[in-house]
């Protein structure tokens, strides 16, 4: 019963998750926070006299998100892929690295969003998620990538046929083929932007 939940039991539960179940710290934290929510509600409703989680603390120990260094990005940019799909995914990833755009913002990017201001090309649009306006100056590399896919543009879409789930697995293959051992997701491209900016 809930009355048997003590601070010692909770500590033993965390040890059990680690040793017997082989869970990492983040997963242990998730399981403990779920149990803590149930226990706190029971305590709040008067079902148990005290909160056994009051003195218990575990950190999620969340790692910093990985990103490609400038050298790794150069390796990716210059690698010759036999598979044209990997080349396309690489170009989208590199584009995101230089513009800090999210996948969905790149997917929704149209030729109308690219404008010339004082002789320079800019992306002027709104973030899909927040609807907040933004502007990004297009440097040489993103401009070259846009130009490369101009022949394939349909319905003003700058990068046609983009689907997030269809690039996840090939992205990992692409990174591995370049000899990069980091666990890289598409979102990591935006974190790399800070090192390039």
What is each residue range found by the language model?
Residues 57, 63-66, 72, 99, ...:
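Conserved tyrosine-mediated DNA breakage-rejoining catalytic core shared by Y-recombinases
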Residues 120-126, 158, 185, 196-197:
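Short functional hotspots where side chains directly engage DNA or cofactors
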Residues 7, 31, 73, 88-90, ...:
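Short, leucine-enriched amphipathic alpha-helices that occur as contiguous helical runs
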Residues 17, 95-96, 196-197:
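Short alpha-helical segment immediately N-terminal to, or the first helix within
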Residues 23-33, 44-103, 152:
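Basic, Lys/Arg- and aromatic-enriched nucleic-acid-binding interface segment
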Residues 139-181:
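Active-site/catalytic core of tyrosine-dependent DNA strand-transfer enzymes
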